[in-house]
Amino acid sequence: MPRVKRGVTARARHKKVIAAAKGYRGRRGNVFRIAKQAVMRAGQYAYRDRRNKKRTFRALWITRINAAVREQGLSYSVFIAGLKKAAIELDRKVLADLAVRDKAGFAAIVQQAKAALAA
């Protein structure tokens, strides 16, 4: 059986890892062994943070809605309860966007929620 020479394959593998580590500081960007570890760790961080991003954005939306609703004289939890009673099915992303971009429209929604709470 002939000997398998892996020069081309190894070079390609190394180039792929070094390319993925482009921009890293020091030996993390140009020494294969260290770059490989850095790229693996970066992948773990990316995987974890793709999940955390959903939490972070939801928290941001809730904070924005809460701030806008308090200007109207309600708290966030009471406002959400009012939306449920009024059968308004807007998600937090849309509500936060309205609170930032369309204050009049958001105020109208808050009034509907208040009316549903009073009824």
Curated annotation (Swiss-Prot):
InterPro entries referenced in this protein's UniProt entry, alphabetically: Ribosomal_bL20, RIBOSOMAL_L20_CS, Ribosomal_protein_bL20_C
Gene Ontology annotations of biological process type: ribosomal large subunit assembly; translation
Entry-linked CDD domains: Ribosomal_L20
One GO CC term on file: ribonucleoprotein complex
Molecular functions (GO terms): rRNA binding; structural constituent of ribosome
Keyword vocabulary terms for this entry: Ribonucleoprotein, Ribosomal protein, RNA-binding, rRNA-binding
Transmembrane segments: none
Role: Binds directly to 23S ribosomal RNA and is necessary for the in vitro assembly process of the 50S ribosomal subunit. It is not involved in the protein synthesizing functions of that subunit.
Family matches, as NCBIfam families: rplT_bact
Family assignment from sequence similarity: Belongs to the bacterial ribosomal protein bL20 family.
Record-given protein name: Large ribosomal subunit protein bL20
Lineage: Bacteria, Pseudomonadati, Pseudomonadota, Betaproteobacteria, Burkholderiales
